[in-house]
Amino acid sequence: MLTRVLLGIEDKTDGSIVFEGKSVDDMTPQEKSDMKAKIQMIFQDTLGSLHPRMSIRESLEEPLILNGVKDKEEREKIILDTLSQVGMAPMFLDRYPHQLSGGQRQRIIIARCLVVTPKIIFADEPISALDVSLQAQVINMLMDLQDKYKLSMLLIAHDLAVVRQIADQIKIMYFGEIVESAPSSEIYKNAQHPYTKVLLKAAPSISKGLEDAGFDIDLKPGDIPDPAKPMPGCPFCTRCIYADERCMKERPEETEVSPGHTVRCHNAGQI
């Protein structure tokens, strides 16, 4: 839902979206159109993200046509250059999505993003549907492309081991609310919110040794809150082993525990 709102597919219910210093609400239709050309999306479903009746060439050519690249030779050059950047050969251009593997489709989807030289790429669980053997390849490729094209990337993921590899800044969300935000290194060595600690413990490749850092915590048996009936207190209180009466009744405010590190927890710094 977050990415759907950011992409303008769904309307926001509150707050504001600012792009390049200007609120989206104050943009003209032309400014919104220009903004959309600078924002691209890598979807989780690789097969559903590509039109089954369009060849790979057509899928890569379409965004160029929509963004005003009228010369066919120029479009072909951009496509071939971009294919090379994602490690795909020209022979794939005349194939169709069902003729490619999941990893190959994901590379084509990334190429489709890059052909229009975006400023921001939203990546929604970009490797969760891939075989483990391919996940590292795609992550390394994203990191290389991010550096080469000077891209900003918003990565949505549940696997903190993956996030650790690629993210500079991490925001932990629970029931649509940011409960902790900090630079990546700070999250992994000094997490303050109980939910963040539970997530870290659940990632086998990074959980070893976390017990000594106070991360050896579990979820409390209980019901998950109903999003349609928001609780007056902390949304995590029904599952938190540290929750007290205040947590049940009073919603925690965002608190800065160190420079650039904020958390929404009444007991931050004490657990």
Can you annotate each of these PLM segments?
Residues S184-I271:
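Charged, flexible cofactor/metal-binding loops and thiol motifs
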Residues G15-S23:
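Conserved ABC transporter NBD signature motif
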